[in-house]
């Protein structure tokens, strides 16, 4: 008998401890769900566009579904080591609370294990089975009616810091099918790959044949009520795991088969030329009139587009195109935020209309960056929240080797939903070939900035932070976090890093607050803080700090904040072509030829022609003329191999070059 036991252990690979614990799994109570038909979907207004079209679904087979979500005790009979995650972030501590911090692979493995153990066929519910079981014959917002009774409510609001609540299962009244906790408690993994609904009547749909995201349903604690609706759709990157998602299971002899082809690519990924562009350096001064790159999609295109379009990134492509991305949302802290894109195709003068670029359904997507590494690869990095807000983001990365026509599946490069992960446009490649990604260190205006470094082309990333709290940001002090948010980072000739940023302003020797400058000589482990010579910027403004192809450093920033800077301190002095000085206001460029020690060249970003423009986002309308440039905006820039500088604000695209910035100005003898 002992030999038989050893043979079983050897063949299955199951340890004795796992075998013993498997015999002690608490009962998973199952409820009979009859076959039937229902109408799936919802009104599809605004961010809920993916709930359309409403369509008839026939569930042709009866099945059993677990009355509640799987608990810690039940899951840990399969994975005892998961017990180490109990109570993380103050949630799901007890045996009878819903298990969380489980990936899609984790829950599929549990179903396979339980199937082997009991000789039955367990799996996840399809999205259609889940909604059918949740509705239980109802068509209200919730199976309880138009609203949620108090028994279901567990801090149902957007929560920057998750409020500890009980996730004990079975505490809500059962619906008409006998299921508890279908609204809230924790989100629940479903079997399907996510994708748009089809309009036709369907039998036993099981989603797309492939996609980047797996469906979740039901909503959770610490999120607004609307995400708990019967018809609300969500999804996650399969490898993601966090405190707001668990699962329940189905027992059925029926095996769903996904038959719907993947979604066609969006417009920004269609008809992309794959011929390498022949770049010719432009030596004459160039300044092109600003034009909008955020253009509303055609009404029948199926692309989402919301009222607030902001926080862009931009890169050049090897085929000569420019690719710009930004977030679109009605609420900056909302779960409906999407990342849109537009392409300025080589040889054309007008940007394409906006189309969807990246969206993990019902997750806040704050923070995007793009980089052409000049080695044939485009990098896209993005933040992804567990739900709403932008404090607890994980970081993901995608790559393209064909000018953005196709992208790799999102790779999670910083898996914890935590601070220091809010991606900022301005990814750089160092002389060592390392990638450096700046990120905000927290959600506030004075939380400083972090960097993440990859030494292997994006496979692995590390934040060199030592875990210490923010230091006092003052001249000469040191710390392990960059002073200011929305930082731009460059590598200096000696290999050190320099950063300029917004907020955490530093007093200079004259007692004036200046834009903070941070310098690190150990690749971001330690930063020394200085007051730069530039005025600080404020809300609705983001700078660009980069090294130009020609060698100098370029800063693009604002002379002041049009509403928050005291009137007497607004504007900066600029030289004109006749050698006289004038006071200008708004967006400017400054150039340094000595690694940031001095900035002898400064120019207001206007050609002097009067224009009435719409800057979008927080900028809105403004007047550009000889002494006024764009007053606010989140800036991002790239420089293509022809040495043209491509700058975007929250809505407008500018194109100019170093020759235009320096035209008519005194250039130091030691310039590049």
Feature annotation, model-predicted:
Residues 33, 39, 43-47, 85, ...:
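Functional-site microenvironments in short loops/helix caps that host divalent-cation chemistry
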Residues 1-9:
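Bacterial N-terminal signal peptides that target proteins for export
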Residues 258-672:
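Asp-box/BNR beta-propeller blade signature and adjacent active/binding-site loops
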Residues 24, 167, 173-175, 208-267:
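Disulfide-stabilized, aromatic/cysteine-rich ligand-recognition loop
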Residues 26-29, 34, 53-55, 59-61, ...:
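Residues that flank catalytic or metal-binding motifs in active/ligand-binding sites
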């Amino acid at each position: 008998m002992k030999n038989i036991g050893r043979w079983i252990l050897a063949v299955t690979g199951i340890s004795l401890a796992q075998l013993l614990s498997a015999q002690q799994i608490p009962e998973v109570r199952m409820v009979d769900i009859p076959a039937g038909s229902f109408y799936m979907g919802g009104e599809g207004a605004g961010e809920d566009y993916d709930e359309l079209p409403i369509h008839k679904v026939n569930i042709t087979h009866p099945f059993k579904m677990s009355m509640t979500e799987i608990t810690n005790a039940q899951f840990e009979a399969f994975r005892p080591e998961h017990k180490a995650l109990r109570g993380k972030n103050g949630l799901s501590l007890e045996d009878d609370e819903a298990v969380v911090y489980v990936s899609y692979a984790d829950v599929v493995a549990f179903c396979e294990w339980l199937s082997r153990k009991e000789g039955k066929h367990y799996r996840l519910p399809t999205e259609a089975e889940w909604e059918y079981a949740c509705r239980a014959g109802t068509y209200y917002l919730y199976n309880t009616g138009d609203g949620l009774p108090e028994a279901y409510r567990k801090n149902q609001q957007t929560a920057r810091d998750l409020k500890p609540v009980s996730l004990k299962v079975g505490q809500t009244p059962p619906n008409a099918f006998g299921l508890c906790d279908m609204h809230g408690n924790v989100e629940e993994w479903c079997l399907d790959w996510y994708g748009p609904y089809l309009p036709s009547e369907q039998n036993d749909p099981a989603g797309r044949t492939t996609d980047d995201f797996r469906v979740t349903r039901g909503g959770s604690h610490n999120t607004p009520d609307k995400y708990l609706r019967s018809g609300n759709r969500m999804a996650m990157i399969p490898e993601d795991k966090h405190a707001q998602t668990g699962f329940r299971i189905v027992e059925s002899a029926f095996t769903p088969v996904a038959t719907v082809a993947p979604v066609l690519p969006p417009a920004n990924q269609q008809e992309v030329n794959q011929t390498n562009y022949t770049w010719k350096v432009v030596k004459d001064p160039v300044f092109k009139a600003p034009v909008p790159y955020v253009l509303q999609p055609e009404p029948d295109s199926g692309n989402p587009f919301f009222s607030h379009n902001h926080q862009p990134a931009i890169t050049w492509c090897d085929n000569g195109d420019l690719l710009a991305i930004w977030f679109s949302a009605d609420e900056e802290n909302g779960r409906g935020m999407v990342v849109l894109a537009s392409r300025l195709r080589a040889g054309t003068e007008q940007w394409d209309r906006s189309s969807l670029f990246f969206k993990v359904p019902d997750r806040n997507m704050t923070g995007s960056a793009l980089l052409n590494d000049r080695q044939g690869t485009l990098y896209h990095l993005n933040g992804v929240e567990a739900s709403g807000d932008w404090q607890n983001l994980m970081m993901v990365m995608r790559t393209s080797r064909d000018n953005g026509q196709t992208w790799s599946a999102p790779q999670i490069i910083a898996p914890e939903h935590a601070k220091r992960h809010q991606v900022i446009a301005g990814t750089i490649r160092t002389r060592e070939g390392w990638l450096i990604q700046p990120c905000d260190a927290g959600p506030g205006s004075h939380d400083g900035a972090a960097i993440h470094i990859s030494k292997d082309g994006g496979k692995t990333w590390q934040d060199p932070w030592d875990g210490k709290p923010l230091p006092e940001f003052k001249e000469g002090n040191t710390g392990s976090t960059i002073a200011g948010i929305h930082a731009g980072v460059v590598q200096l000739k000696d290999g050190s890093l320099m950063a300029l940023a917004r907020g955490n302003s530093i007093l200079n020797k004259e007692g004036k607050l200046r834009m903070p400058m941070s310098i690190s000589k150990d690749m971001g482990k330690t930063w020394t803080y200085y007051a730069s010579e530039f005025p600080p910027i404020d809300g609705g403004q983001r700078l660009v700090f980069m090294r130009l192809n020609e060698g100098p450093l370029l800063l693009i920033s604002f002379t002041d904040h049009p509403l928050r800077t005291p009137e007497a301190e607004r504007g900066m002095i600029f030289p004109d072509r006749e050698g006289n000085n004038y006071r200008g206001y708004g967006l400017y460029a400054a150039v340094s030829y000595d690694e940031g020690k001095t900035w002898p060249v400064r120019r207001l970003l206007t050609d002097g022609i009067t224009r009435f423009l719409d800057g979008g986002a927080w900028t809105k309308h403004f007047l550009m003329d000889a002494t006024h440039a764009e007053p606010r905006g989140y800036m991002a820039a790239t420089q293509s191999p022809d040495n043209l500088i491509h700058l975007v604000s929250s809505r407008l695209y500018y194109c100019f070059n170093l020759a235009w910035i320096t035209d008519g100005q005194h250039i130091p003898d030691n310039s590049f």
